[in-house]
Regions:
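Mid-domain alpha/beta scaffold segments of enzyme catalytic cores
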Residues: 1-273
Protein backbone atom coordinates (compact mmCIF):
# COMPACT_ATOMS: atom_id res chain seq x y z
CA UNK A 1 0.00 0.00 0.00
CA UNK A 2 1.49 3.40 -0.95
CA UNK A 3 2.26 5.84 1.83
CA UNK A 4 2.38 9.64 1.75
CA UNK A 5 5.73 11.37 1.79
CA UNK A 6 6.85 13.31 4.84
CA UNK A 7 4.38 15.99 5.96
CA UNK A 8 4.80 19.06 3.75
CA UNK A 9 2.70 22.12 4.57
CA UNK A 10 0.77 24.08 1.93
CA UNK A 11 0.62 21.37 -0.74
CA UNK A 12 -2.02 21.61 -3.46
CA UNK A 13 -3.21 19.09 -6.04
CA UNK A 14 -4.00 20.92 -9.26
CA UNK A 15 -5.58 17.95 -11.07
CA UNK A 16 -7.05 14.75 -9.71
CA UNK A 17 -10.06 12.54 -10.45
CA UNK A 18 -11.75 11.87 -7.12
CA UNK A 19 -14.64 10.00 -8.72
CA UNK A 20 -12.26 7.64 -10.54
CA UNK A 21 -10.40 7.17 -7.25
CA UNK A 22 -13.68 5.90 -5.77
CA UNK A 23 -14.96 9.09 -4.13
CA UNK A 24 -18.42 9.35 -5.63
CA UNK A 25 -20.34 10.75 -2.65
CA UNK A 26 -19.74 13.44 -0.04
CA UNK A 27 -18.68 11.02 2.70
CA UNK A 28 -16.02 9.35 0.56
CA UNK A 29 -14.80 12.69 -0.77
CA UNK A 30 -14.31 13.76 2.85
CA UNK A 31 -12.27 10.60 3.56
CA UNK A 32 -9.90 11.34 0.67
CA UNK A 33 -9.56 14.97 1.72
CA UNK A 34 -8.86 13.97 5.32
CA UNK A 35 -6.02 11.70 4.20
CA UNK A 36 -4.70 14.49 1.98
CA UNK A 37 -4.86 16.98 4.86
CA UNK A 38 -2.77 14.61 6.98
CA UNK A 39 -0.03 14.82 4.32
CA UNK A 40 -0.18 18.63 4.14
CA UNK A 41 -2.49 19.01 1.14
CA UNK A 42 -4.68 22.07 1.62
CA UNK A 43 -6.65 22.30 -1.64
CA UNK A 44 -7.61 19.89 -4.42
CA UNK A 45 -9.00 20.40 -7.93
CA UNK A 46 -11.00 17.38 -9.04
CA UNK A 47 -11.64 16.93 -12.74
CA UNK A 48 -14.34 15.44 -14.92
CA UNK A 49 -13.35 13.66 -18.14
CA UNK A 50 -16.93 13.25 -19.36
CA UNK A 51 -20.24 14.86 -18.51
CA UNK A 52 -21.17 12.31 -15.84
CA UNK A 53 -17.83 12.64 -14.07
CA UNK A 54 -17.94 16.43 -14.44
CA UNK A 55 -21.23 16.34 -12.52
CA UNK A 56 -19.52 14.29 -9.80
CA UNK A 57 -16.56 16.69 -9.74
CA UNK A 58 -18.87 19.65 -9.22
CA UNK A 59 -20.81 17.77 -6.55
CA UNK A 60 -17.55 16.95 -4.75
CA UNK A 61 -16.57 20.62 -4.85
CA UNK A 62 -19.95 21.64 -3.47
CA UNK A 63 -19.60 19.11 -0.65
CA UNK A 64 -16.20 20.21 0.70
CA UNK A 65 -14.65 23.66 1.18
CA UNK A 66 -11.16 22.47 0.19
CA UNK A 67 -12.23 20.96 -3.15
CA UNK A 68 -12.80 22.82 -6.41
CA UNK A 69 -13.77 21.40 -9.79
CA UNK A 70 -12.80 21.46 -13.45
CA UNK A 71 -15.51 20.45 -15.91
CA UNK A 72 -15.29 19.39 -19.57
CA UNK A 73 -15.50 16.42 -21.89
CA UNK A 74 -12.19 14.62 -22.49
CA UNK A 75 -10.93 14.77 -26.08
CA UNK A 76 -11.19 11.01 -26.54
CA UNK A 77 -14.90 11.30 -25.66
CA UNK A 78 -15.53 14.39 -27.77
CA UNK A 79 -18.36 12.71 -29.69
CA UNK A 80 -20.39 13.04 -26.47
CA UNK A 81 -20.45 16.82 -26.94
CA UNK A 82 -24.00 17.18 -28.22
CA UNK A 83 -26.22 20.23 -27.79
CA UNK A 84 -27.44 19.15 -24.35
CA UNK A 85 -23.88 18.56 -23.14
CA UNK A 86 -22.79 21.95 -24.45
CA UNK A 87 -25.63 23.68 -22.64
CA UNK A 88 -24.88 21.88 -19.38
CA UNK A 89 -21.15 22.64 -19.59
CA UNK A 90 -21.93 26.33 -20.04
CA UNK A 91 -24.04 26.15 -16.87
CA UNK A 92 -21.25 24.36 -15.00
CA UNK A 93 -18.72 26.96 -16.14
CA UNK A 94 -20.73 29.66 -14.41
CA UNK A 95 -20.73 27.81 -11.07
CA UNK A 96 -18.44 29.49 -8.52
CA UNK A 97 -16.79 26.18 -7.58
CA UNK A 98 -15.97 25.32 -11.20
CA UNK A 99 -12.56 26.97 -11.45
CA UNK A 100 -11.41 25.60 -14.81
CA UNK A 101 -12.72 24.17 -18.06
CA UNK A 102 -11.04 20.82 -18.50
CA UNK A 103 -9.77 18.52 -19.20
CA UNK A 104 -10.03 19.20 -22.90
CA UNK A 105 -7.41 19.04 -25.62
CA UNK A 106 -6.08 16.63 -28.24
CA UNK A 107 -5.05 12.98 -28.04
CA UNK A 108 -3.68 11.03 -31.02
CA UNK A 109 -2.34 8.16 -28.91
CA UNK A 110 -5.78 6.63 -28.39
CA UNK A 111 -6.80 7.36 -31.99
CA UNK A 112 -4.03 4.97 -33.01
CA UNK A 113 -4.56 2.39 -30.29
CA UNK A 114 -8.37 2.38 -29.92
CA UNK A 115 -9.70 4.09 -33.04
CA UNK A 116 -13.22 2.69 -32.74
CA UNK A 117 -13.59 4.05 -29.20
CA UNK A 118 -11.85 7.40 -29.69
CA UNK A 119 -13.13 10.59 -31.28
CA UNK A 120 -11.30 11.50 -34.52
CA UNK A 121 -8.88 14.41 -34.41
CA UNK A 122 -11.21 16.80 -36.26
CA UNK A 123 -13.96 16.13 -33.71
CA UNK A 124 -11.49 16.61 -30.88
CA UNK A 125 -10.36 19.92 -32.33
CA UNK A 126 -13.90 21.24 -32.65
CA UNK A 127 -14.59 20.21 -29.05
CA UNK A 128 -11.40 21.91 -27.89
CA UNK A 129 -12.41 25.14 -29.61
CA UNK A 130 -15.83 24.94 -27.94
CA UNK A 131 -14.22 24.50 -24.52
CA UNK A 132 -11.85 27.41 -25.18
CA UNK A 133 -14.83 29.62 -25.96
CA UNK A 134 -16.55 28.50 -22.76
CA UNK A 135 -13.44 29.24 -20.69
CA UNK A 136 -13.07 32.70 -22.23
CA UNK A 137 -16.75 33.54 -21.77
CA UNK A 138 -16.76 32.36 -18.14
CA UNK A 139 -13.42 33.95 -17.28
CA UNK A 140 -12.07 30.59 -16.10
CA UNK A 141 -8.78 28.77 -16.65
CA UNK A 142 -8.46 26.28 -19.51
CA UNK A 143 -7.09 22.85 -18.54
CA UNK A 144 -5.42 21.00 -21.42
CA UNK A 145 -4.92 17.28 -22.00
CA UNK A 146 -2.24 16.65 -24.63
CA UNK A 147 -1.08 13.21 -25.65
CA UNK A 148 1.19 13.05 -28.69
CA UNK A 149 -0.47 16.06 -30.34
CA UNK A 150 2.02 18.86 -29.69
CA UNK A 151 1.98 20.57 -33.09
CA UNK A 152 -1.79 20.52 -33.53
CA UNK A 153 -2.35 21.66 -29.96
CA UNK A 154 0.02 24.62 -30.26
CA UNK A 155 -1.64 25.54 -33.56
CA UNK A 156 -5.15 25.57 -32.08
CA UNK A 157 -4.14 27.37 -28.90
CA UNK A 158 -2.22 29.88 -30.99
CA UNK A 159 -5.11 30.89 -33.24
CA UNK A 160 -8.00 30.60 -30.76
CA UNK A 161 -9.05 33.25 -28.23
CA UNK A 162 -6.86 33.23 -25.12
CA UNK A 163 -8.32 32.34 -21.72
CA UNK A 164 -6.91 34.13 -18.70
CA UNK A 165 -4.79 31.05 -17.92
CA UNK A 166 -3.99 27.92 -19.94
CA UNK A 167 -2.79 24.91 -17.94
CA UNK A 168 -0.93 22.08 -19.66
CA UNK A 169 -1.87 19.27 -17.30
CA UNK A 170 0.47 16.31 -16.73
CA UNK A 171 3.08 18.02 -18.86
CA UNK A 172 5.02 15.36 -20.77
CA UNK A 173 6.15 17.06 -23.98
CA UNK A 174 9.72 17.72 -25.16
CA UNK A 175 11.82 20.70 -24.11
CA UNK A 176 11.10 22.65 -27.31
CA UNK A 177 7.36 22.50 -26.59
CA UNK A 178 7.96 23.54 -22.99
CA UNK A 179 9.93 26.59 -24.13
CA UNK A 180 7.16 27.63 -26.51
CA UNK A 181 4.51 27.09 -23.82
CA UNK A 182 6.49 29.13 -21.31
CA UNK A 183 6.95 31.94 -23.83
CA UNK A 184 3.19 32.01 -24.38
CA UNK A 185 2.59 32.28 -20.65
CA UNK A 186 1.02 28.85 -20.19
CA UNK A 187 1.13 27.10 -16.83
CA UNK A 188 2.87 23.71 -16.77
CA UNK A 189 1.51 21.17 -14.28
CA UNK A 190 3.71 18.21 -13.33
CA UNK A 191 2.38 14.81 -12.23
CA UNK A 192 3.99 11.68 -10.81
CA UNK A 193 5.67 10.79 -14.09
CA UNK A 194 8.26 13.49 -13.34
CA UNK A 195 9.60 11.07 -10.70
CA UNK A 196 10.06 8.15 -13.12
CA UNK A 197 13.66 7.02 -13.53
CA UNK A 198 13.91 7.59 -17.28
CA UNK A 199 12.24 11.02 -17.30
CA UNK A 200 15.35 13.16 -16.80
CA UNK A 201 14.29 15.55 -19.57
CA UNK A 202 11.00 16.17 -17.77
CA UNK A 203 12.86 16.94 -14.54
CA UNK A 204 15.03 19.40 -16.45
CA UNK A 205 11.88 21.06 -17.77
CA UNK A 206 10.44 21.24 -14.24
CA UNK A 207 13.67 22.95 -13.21
CA UNK A 208 13.50 25.61 -15.93
CA UNK A 209 9.83 26.60 -15.71
CA UNK A 210 9.42 30.03 -14.11
CA UNK A 211 8.13 29.48 -10.59
CA UNK A 212 4.93 31.46 -11.27
CA UNK A 213 4.06 29.14 -14.21
CA UNK A 214 4.29 25.90 -12.21
CA UNK A 215 1.66 23.61 -10.70
CA UNK A 216 1.87 20.09 -9.25
CA UNK A 217 -0.81 17.43 -9.55
CA UNK A 218 -1.48 13.76 -8.96
CA UNK A 219 -3.73 12.95 -11.94
CA UNK A 220 -4.99 10.26 -9.55
CA UNK A 221 -5.81 7.42 -9.68
CA UNK A 222 -3.12 7.38 -12.39
CA UNK A 223 0.52 8.53 -12.52
CA UNK A 224 1.48 7.32 -9.05
CA UNK A 225 4.94 8.67 -8.22
CA UNK A 226 8.03 6.66 -7.40
CA UNK A 227 8.44 4.68 -5.15
CA UNK A 228 4.86 3.47 -5.67
CA UNK A 229 4.64 3.59 -9.47
CA UNK A 230 1.88 1.27 -10.69
CA UNK A 231 -0.18 1.41 -7.50
CA UNK A 232 -3.43 3.35 -7.22
CA UNK A 233 -2.79 7.04 -6.72
CA UNK A 234 -4.64 9.64 -4.62
CA UNK A 235 -4.07 13.27 -3.55
CA UNK A 236 -2.35 12.26 -0.30
CA UNK A 237 0.64 11.03 -2.31
CA UNK A 238 1.48 14.32 -4.03
CA UNK A 239 4.33 15.02 -1.61
CA UNK A 240 6.55 12.54 -3.47
CA UNK A 241 6.15 14.59 -6.64
CA UNK A 242 6.72 17.86 -4.78
CA UNK A 243 9.98 16.51 -3.33
CA UNK A 244 11.17 15.47 -6.80
CA UNK A 245 10.37 18.84 -8.38
CA UNK A 246 11.95 20.71 -5.47
CA UNK A 247 15.12 18.63 -5.84
CA UNK A 248 15.21 19.29 -9.59
CA UNK A 249 14.94 23.02 -8.88
CA UNK A 250 17.47 22.89 -6.01
CA UNK A 251 15.04 24.61 -3.66
CA UNK A 252 13.51 23.66 -0.30
CA UNK A 253 10.26 21.76 -0.75
CA UNK A 254 8.54 24.08 1.74
CA UNK A 255 9.30 27.07 -0.49
CA UNK A 256 8.12 25.17 -3.57
CA UNK A 257 4.85 24.22 -1.89
CA UNK A 258 4.19 27.83 -0.86
CA UNK A 259 4.88 29.15 -4.36
CA UNK A 260 2.77 26.48 -6.04
CA UNK A 261 -0.10 27.12 -3.61
CA UNK A 262 -0.01 30.80 -4.56
CA UNK A 263 -0.14 29.79 -8.24
CA UNK A 264 -3.06 27.42 -7.55
CA UNK A 265 -5.02 30.23 -5.90
CA UNK A 266 -4.20 32.75 -8.65
CA UNK A 267 -4.86 30.47 -11.64
CA UNK A 268 -8.05 29.03 -10.16
CA UNK A 269 -9.11 32.41 -8.74
CA UNK A 270 -9.60 31.07 -5.22
CA UNK A 271 -11.09 33.80 -3.06
CA UNK A 272 -9.25 34.44 0.19
CA UNK A 273 -11.41 34.02 3.31
Amino acid sequence: MPEPAEYIAHLTDAHTHLASCGARDAATVAEFVTRAHAAGVERICTVGDGLAEAELALAAAESHPDVVAACAIHPTKARELDDAARARLREMAAHPKCVAIGETGLDTYWIRHRPDETAPLAVQEEALRFHIDVAVAAGKALMIHNREADADLLRVLGDAPSPKYTILHCFSSPTAVAKEAIARGYVLSFAGNVTFKNNEELRQIAAMVPIDQLLIETDAPFMTPVPYRGAKNEPAFIGHTALCVAAARSMPVAKLAEAVAANFDRVYQIAKP
